[in-house]
Amino acid sequence: LLAADRPETDRPANRILDIDNPWARVKAHLLCGLGSALRCQCILLATPQPGTRIHVFGYASDLERTDVLYASVLIQMWHGLAGAQVPAWCRSARAWRRSWLLGFATAVISRVRAAEHAAACRATGPEAAAGSRTALVLADRSHVVRAEAERAYPLTRTARVTYSGSGYRDGYAEGQRADIGTGRVTRGRGRALTRAS
């Protein structure tokens, strides 16, 4: 609501980010999923360098929330993977770890999306003082971000995430336990992501 009354407090913005190896595609999946849950739009770009390049569009506050949450979850994801045991019968430890990471990321993204949906419902419900106004602001912000991304990249296609390996279920279970900051406000000054030069 503050952004609607005083647009100078929060403006649409975008940044191009480089996600380094190892596991760049999995990290990109996590970042894009969190960004989408927090009303940002992510476009994967071709790059000759190893890793993945992503152009992220969103309001400045949503970009910051995505950045802070991504940094926090990434640390938890690496910690969880370090403690995970690859089964002795597993034919490819790398495939098992990649599927574990995808399971973790998918669980976290799903939880953040559900938390954002619940927060929006509370803010726009009949008991909320400015419910209908909040709904309009959220819808307008989503429209503005989508239009900015489409203006920059009129032709895009949806990327599919696939995996092989049997670690997905274990990773998903660990992602269900990850701290996503539900119920508290987190602010951060540090940049977890590397801005492209």
Name each model feature, range by range.
Residues 3-197:
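Extended, helix-rich structural scaffolds rather than catalytic motifs
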